[in-house]
C-alpha cells in the first residue's frame, strides 16, 4: 500500500513537524507491530513545499534520513511529474487542508477509470488538533467531490470519538530508554549540555512564539526559585533568545536561573529533552503533543489569532486537561497556562507532575493517531 502525504508549511515547524512525525510513525508501523497494529508492505512518500524547514528537524537531510527510514521525501512540484501521476497513492493525506495539485487530483480520479476493478484512493484531510466538542461529530465525515471521489475529514483529538494524537516512538521514551542512568543515554546533540547542568537544578525547556511575554515570565520563575531555594536551568530551544536586559540579569551570581542556548535539534532529541525537563513551554501542534506524552507540566503558547479563536481552542483543551484534577490544581494550572506568575504554581509542581502522568495514561488508553488512521483505512478497504 502506498501512502502519499502532502504538507505545505504554514506554521513554520508545527505543520512540518506533524507531517514528518506521521510519516515516521507509519514507516515504523510498516516494519513492526506496535500495540497489535501493523501496516504491511507500506511505501510512504512525503511531499513538502519547503524542504529547508523539513531538513531542520530531520538531521539536516530530510531526503537522506527519510530514505534510511523507508520514507521518500519529495518536493511539492514532484507531485505533478509523470512518474508520480502514474502511481498516485492508495491512501492520500492532505495535511491541514493544503489543497492537492490539480493534476494529482485528476490522476486520483482517473485511477479507477483506467483499470477494471481498481479501487479509488482513500483521500483523507488531516485537520488541526482540537479539543472542541464539535470535532466528535465531524471526525471521519465524508465530503463527496465532483470527480466521484470522497474526501474524509480526520480530526485528531482527546476523546474516543476523535482520531487521537500522534505517538510515534514515544513508547521507547516512556519505557526508560532515555531516562536510565542519568543523562548517559542522552543523544549526542544534548549530552554535553545536560551534563553541564547544575546538580539538582530544575530544568525548563522553552520553545515559544515571539509574542510571548517571556522575559516577565522568566523573571517570575527566577523569583519563585529563589523563594524556594532552588536553581533552574532554562533551555532556550531552536536558537530562541531573550532581551539583553534579561540575559544580563540572569548572568549575575545571585540569579537562580541559568540560560542555556540550544540550536535546532532532531525531533527525537527534542522528545528526549522534554522527558528530562520538569516543565516545558511549547507552542505549535507537534511540540504541544510531545509535551503531553512527556507526562510533565507544560505551558502551551498557543498561536494568537486576530479573531481570538485561539482562546476558544485553548479553553476547550484546558477544560479537558484539568477535568480530573483537584480544584486547587485546576485553578492554579489555568492561571499558569495564561502566563500567571510562577510564584503561584511553583509550590504545586509535584501535584501537576502527577496529574500530567495521569493525563498521559489517558491519551494512551484512547489509542494513538497512527493506529487509528490505519484502522480507518483498513475498514475502508474492507467495505469497498
Task: Please describe what each predicted stretch is.
Residues 2, 90-91, 122, 203, ...:
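Structural motif
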Residues 125-214:
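A nucleotide-sugar donor-handling region in carbohydrate enzymes
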Residues 297-340:
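Nucleotide-sugar donor-binding patch of glycosyltransferase catalytic domains
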Residues 5-16, 207-212, 279:
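Short, glycine-rich nucleotide/cofactor-binding loops
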Residues 227-263:
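Catalytic donor nucleotide-activated moiety binding site of glycosyltransferases and closely related
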Residues 6-148:
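Active-site and donor-binding regions of nucleotide-sugar-utilizing enzymes
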Residues 323-384:
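C-terminal amphipathic helix plus adjacent low-complexity
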Residues 8, 20-23, 264-313:
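A donor-sugar binding/catalytic signature common to diverse glycosyltransferases
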Amino acid at each position: 500500500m502506498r501512502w502519499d502525504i502532502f504538507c505545505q508549511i504554514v506554521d513554520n515547524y508545527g505543520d512540518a513537524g506533524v507531517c514528518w512525525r506521521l510519516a515516521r510513525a507509519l514507516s515504523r508501523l510498516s516494519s513492526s507491530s506496535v500495540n497489535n497494529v501493523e501496516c504491511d508492505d507500506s511505501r510512504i512518500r512525503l511531499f513538502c513545499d519547503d524542504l529547508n524547514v523539513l531538513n531542520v528537524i530531520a538531521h539536516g537531510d530530510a531526503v537522506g534520513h527519510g530514505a534510511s527510514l523507508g520514507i521518500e521525501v519529495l518536493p511539492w512540484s514532484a507531485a505533478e511529474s509523470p512518474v508520480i501521476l502514474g502511481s498516485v497513492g492508495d491512501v492520500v493525506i492532505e495535511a491541514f487542508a493544503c489543497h492537492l495539485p490539480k493534476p494529482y487530483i485528476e490522476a486520483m480520479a482517473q485511477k479507477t477509470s483506467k483499470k477494471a476493478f481498481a479501487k479509488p484512493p482513500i483521500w483523507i484531510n488531516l485537520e488541526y488538533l482540537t479539543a472542541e466538542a464539535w470535532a466528535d461529530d465531524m471526525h471521519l465525515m465524508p465530503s463527496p467531490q465532483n470527480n466521484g471521489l470522497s474526501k474524509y475529514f480526520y480530526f485528531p483529538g482527546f476523546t474516543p470519538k476523535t482520531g487521537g494524537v500522534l505517538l510515534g516512538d514515544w513508547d521507547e521514551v516512556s519505557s526508560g530508554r532515555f531516562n536510565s542512568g542519568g543523562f548517559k543515554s542522552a543523544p549526542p546533540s544534548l549530552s554535553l549540555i545536560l551534563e553541564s547542568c547544575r546538580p539538582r537544578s530544575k530544568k525548563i525547556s522553552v520553545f515559544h512564539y515571539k509574542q510571548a511575554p517571556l522575559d516577565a515570565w522568566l523573571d517570575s520563575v527566577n523569583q519563585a526559585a529563589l523563594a524556594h531555594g532552588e536553581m533552574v536551568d532554562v533551555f532556550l530551544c531552536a536558537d530562541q533568545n531573550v532581551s539583553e536586559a534579561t540575559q544580563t540579569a540572569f548572568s549575575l551570581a545571585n540569579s537562580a536561573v541559568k540560560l542555556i542556548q540550544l540550536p535546532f535539534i532532531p525531533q527525537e532529541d527534542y522528545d528526549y529533552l522534554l522527558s528530562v525537563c520538569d516543565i516545558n513551554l511549547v507552542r505549535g501542534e507537534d511540540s504541544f503533543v510531545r509535551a503531553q506524552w512527556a507526562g510533565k507540566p507544560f505551558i502551551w503558547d498557543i498561536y494568537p489569532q486576530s479573531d481570538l479563536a485561539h482562546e476558544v481552542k485553548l479553553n476547550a483543551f484546558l477544560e479537558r486537561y484539568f477535568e480530573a484534577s483537584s480544584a486547587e490544581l485546576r485553578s492554579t494550572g489555568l492561571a499558569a497556562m495564561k502566563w500567571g506568575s510562577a510564584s503561584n504554581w511553583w509550590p504545586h509542581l509535584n501535584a501537576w507532575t502527577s496529574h500530567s502522568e495521569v493525563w498521559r495514561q489517558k491519551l494512551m488508553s484512547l489509542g494513538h493517531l497512527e493506529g487509528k488512521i490505519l484502522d480507518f483505512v483498513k475498514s475502508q478497504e474492507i467495505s469497498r
